């Protein structure tokens, strides 16, 4: 079930040089990622989907309108407290984690073969952050049809090797039934780039 974007949301996303800063994403309940990636997710996520998210915020509020439930992890304590206080409902399970090691440890408690979409976008407040490791550690817990969203891929600070991978490299670990699509409409932003891996 896709949502209908408001005129304010559309106007904000179309203004690339403003949208790239993401200052209104929380207020407008939008993910802070490439606008075409947002449109793709809006068109392809389903109301019965269970979502695993690393990095809470406007994206959490956006996906909350589309999917069945969200299990979200956040490393900024103030941000975590504010979201949980202002947007607490039965569909969203908020988790605070301080470090990469703590997060990886908690992944062992995830339900296996449960999540339909996995979004890796956690911020730099996570001590020892390694988004690439998070992605790899999640795979054994996911379904064979899980959609993966890897954000900020063009930044060397976020993904080290896998952003250089070709589709075949991902198929070697996810299966030949996967396809890949990259979004990058803000080349002036050094943290740009959203990669989505999805089953055919």
Positions of predicted regions on the chain:
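Class I SAM-dependent methyltransferase Rossmann-like catalytic core
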Residues: 4-48
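Generic enzyme active-site microenvironment
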Residues: 51, 72, 119, 149-150
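N-terminal pre-catalytic "stem/leader" segment of glycosyltransferase-like enzymes
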Residues: 14-24, 45-66, 172-177, 194-200
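C-terminal substrate-binding/active-site "lid" region of AdoMet-derived donor-dependent transferases
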Residues: 117, 124-200
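SAM cofactor-binding core of SAM-dependent methyltransferases
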Residues: 31-102
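A short acidic, Gly/Pro-enriched loop at the edge of an enzyme's catalytic core
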Residues: 108-117
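Surface-exposed cleft-lining segments at the edges of enzyme active sites
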Residues: 23-30, 117-126
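Anionic group-transfer/hydrolysis microenvironments
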Residues: 55, 76, 123, 153-154
